[in-house]
Amino acid sequence: MKKIEAIIKPFKLDEVKEALHEVGIKGITVTEAKGFGRQKGHTELYRGAEYVVDFLPKVKIEVVMEDNLVERAVEAIQQAAHTGRIGDGKIFVTTIEEAIRIRTGERGPDAI
């Protein structure tokens, strides 16, 4: 099993969710996040004072799947989240040793 974590622009969430559904992903976890990388921040004026806004709003998507779905899921996220501009995000793929459904006690792929 693998876990995909994707950090994307918030306005791309619906497109990414739909793209993942089309490749057979049935459930995702979404977390609002803030961060910066190459995109960096920007300066805003508030009541005559300048403020540097370092952290920009992002969305983190987490999904665990069987190994055979990983490449299709990564491609779906890349295509749906792509704008061609700095700040499109990142995708991380990690190995999951075990998954357990708390309600039933199911383990492994049956738990996801």
Predicted regions and their residues:
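Positively charged, small/polar-rich N-terminal and surface patches that mediate targeting and assembly
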Residues: M1-I112
